[in-house]
Amino acid sequence: MNQDIHNFIQYLHQEKQTSENTEVSYERDLKKMILYLTAHGVDRIDAVTPEVLNSYVIELEQSGLKPATVSRSVASMKAFFHYEELEQRTSADPAFELKAPKVEKKAPTILTTEQTNRLLAQPKDNSAKGLRDKAMLELLYATGIRVSELISLKLTDVNFDTGYITCVDSHKERMIPMTPVAKDALVRYIRE
């Protein structure tokens, strides 16, 4: 069954072009599932039943894991068994009707104006690191891009003439305007 997981992760990477974090999480979730299955006498993919998967989800919930963690595990299992069915390694998808627990969506904590100003004022020195940190914070604040988008940003994604940055994520491209302050911080970092 470990080879099945390996093949699935390769499929995600090559065909679905998933992020490394997604692949690591899915692999960890599925290896834990395999341990449970093996401990309960299931040693082949085609021997997995909806009942044993349901029991596993109940055990995850009762172990004190957060609903979001259990929900991600269910998503991992559903994707894995769907793949196994497509690859004809199992005649039916045992995870098809598996239900994930409800996850409460919490509103993000919003910084006050004072907190934001203090955060943006943090990088005080003119060292390369200080200028880099200032440029990063200003870009995050001014554009609302994700940290993952920021760290994958290339110089060619920045158009200083128009004041826009281009973010490419999951085959989508977004043009996002920079504020003059963010643009200046970025120019200053690049010049140093």
Predicted regions span which residues?
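Conserved catalytic core of the tyrosine transesterase superfamily
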Residues: 1-192
